[in-house]
């Protein structure tokens, strides 16, 4: 008798995706982050669902409803801290996942890569709107500053901002629509994730060597299911350590003060995972220029396949490109640090230099290194 997982219409899809999927035998731990992101998404949806049961999207009660969740709801505090720190873990896994794809040349799978960029934008939008919901000082002012950036768009900017706000300032209408969108977007992310997987399984996974793995493939289960579970354990450990011992380590103390439109915090800054883009935004003195640089800092990922000049796909045997890649990673850490600092000397000049080097490494130096390495191979 044929196994039910190979004949049943529904189980057959699961079987081809997670059990009998032919996978390259040499993929490393860097390929674990896809499954970790899936687990983060499931956890965010579950914790978010329980938080939404007790949260009220109203300017007068939003802050106190979050306090009520932490104080009065059974295990409300752990649900809330798992959700906030879960977002941080989500972005850590997301950035490592993108970094791995850049290092090993996975962006050559165009459909998968483009869906991935759409996923990144959607996750960023969801996280931003989630940060507004507790209605603390940083929530309110973060929402005001970031949405106000759209006013830099010529002609329609001001109208667009007021349309998003639902009035002439960030108020009840803004909070209600942000809550609605924050609730619905994770389900859109889930649909996009399924599309991402669908396109990935059309081509098969990449591998560290960047060559065709067709000659040596193994079934996904049990080999990679075990490997993914092994990767899941440290992630759960870090997450629980954050939620139980250092729940506010990655947050902002200003968000424990209720939102006050009459009192501006000394330093308005977003969550740590947006600081690199925020630093690029601030490094340009012109408003429209800053907004364009902010969008391009992430949208630049879409043109990576066009900038690939090397004959080899992976950076594994390309020392010059490797050096540039790690310079880019260090540069991103510098930008993240600068994004959290006040706008004063020497931070402004460091931010401007880091922003210039960020774009030059990706747009000029990496393609040049690829061409140099092509010529070196002829020697």
Swiss-Prot record:
InterPro entries: Cyt_b/b6_C, Cyt_b/b6_C_sf, Cyt_b/b6_N, Cytb/b6-like_sf, Cytochrome_b, Cytochrome_b_C_euk/bac, Cytochrome_b_N_euk/bac, Di-haem_cyt_TM. Its main location: mitochondrion. Pfam families: Cytochrom_B_C, Cytochrome_B. CDD domains: cytochrome_b_C, Cytochrome_b_N. Heme b b566 binds at residues 97, 196. One of its GO terms (cellular component) is respiratory chain complex III. Heme b b562 binds at residues 83, 182. The cytochrome bc1 complex contains 11 subunits: 3 respiratory subunits (MT-CYB, CYC1 and UQCRFS1), 2 core proteins (UQCRC1 and UQCRC2) and 6 low-molecular weight proteins (UQCRH/QCR6, UQCRB/QCR7, UQCRQ/QCR8, UQCR10/QCR9, UQCR11/QCR10 and a cleavage product of UQCRFS1). This cytochrome bc1 complex then forms a dimer. This is Cytochrome b. It comes from Choloepus didactylus (Southern two-toed sloth). The gene is MT-CYB.
């Amino acid at each position: 008798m044929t196994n039910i997982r190979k004949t049943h219409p529904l189980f057959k899809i699961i079987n081809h995706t997670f059990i009998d999927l032919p996978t390259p035998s040499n993929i490393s731990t860097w390929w674990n982050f896809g499954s970790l992101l899936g687990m983060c998404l499931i956890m965010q949806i579950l914790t978010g669902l329980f938080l939404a049961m007790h949260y009220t999207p109203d300017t007068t009660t939003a802050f106190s409803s979050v306090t009520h969740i932490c104080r009065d709801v059974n295990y409300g505090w752990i649900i809330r801290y798992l959700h906030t720190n879960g977002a941080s873990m989500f972005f850590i896994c997301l950035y490592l996942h993108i970094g791995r794809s850049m290092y090993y040349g996975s962006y050559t799978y165009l459909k998968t890569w483009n869906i991935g960029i759409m996923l990144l934008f959607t996750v960023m939008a969801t996280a931003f709107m989630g940060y507004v919901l507790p209605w603390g000082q940083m929530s309110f002012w973060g929402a005001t500053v970031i949405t106000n950036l759209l006013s830099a768009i010529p002609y329609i900017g001001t109208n667009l901002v007021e349309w998003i706000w639902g009035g002439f300032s960030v108020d009840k209408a803004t909070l209600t629509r942000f809550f609605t969108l924050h609730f619905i977007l994770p389900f859109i992310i889930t649909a996009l994730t399924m599309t991402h997987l669908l396109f990935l399984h059309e081509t098969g996974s990449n591998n560290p060597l960047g060559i065709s793995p067709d000659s040596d493939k193994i079934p996904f289960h049990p080999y990679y299911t075990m490997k993914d579970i092994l990767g899941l354990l440290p992630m759960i450990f870090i997450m629980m350590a954050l939620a139980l011992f250092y729940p506010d380590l990655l947050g902002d103390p200003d968000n424990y003060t209720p939102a006050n439109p009459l009192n501006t915090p000394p330093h308005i800054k977003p969550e740590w995972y947006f600081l690199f883009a925020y630093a690029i935004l601030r490094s340009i003195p012109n408003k429209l220029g800053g907004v364009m640089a902010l969008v391009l800092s992430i949208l630049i990922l879409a043109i990576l396949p066009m900038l690939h000049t090397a004959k080899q796909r992976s950076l594994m045997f390309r020392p010059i490109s490797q050096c540039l890649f790690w310079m880019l990673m260090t540069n991103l850490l510098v930008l993240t640090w600068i994004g959290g600092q006040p706008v004063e000397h020497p931070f402004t000049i460091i931010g401007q230099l880091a922003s210039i080097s960020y774009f030059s490494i990706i747009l000029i130096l990496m393609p040049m290194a690829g061409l140099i390495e092509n010529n070196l191979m002829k020697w």
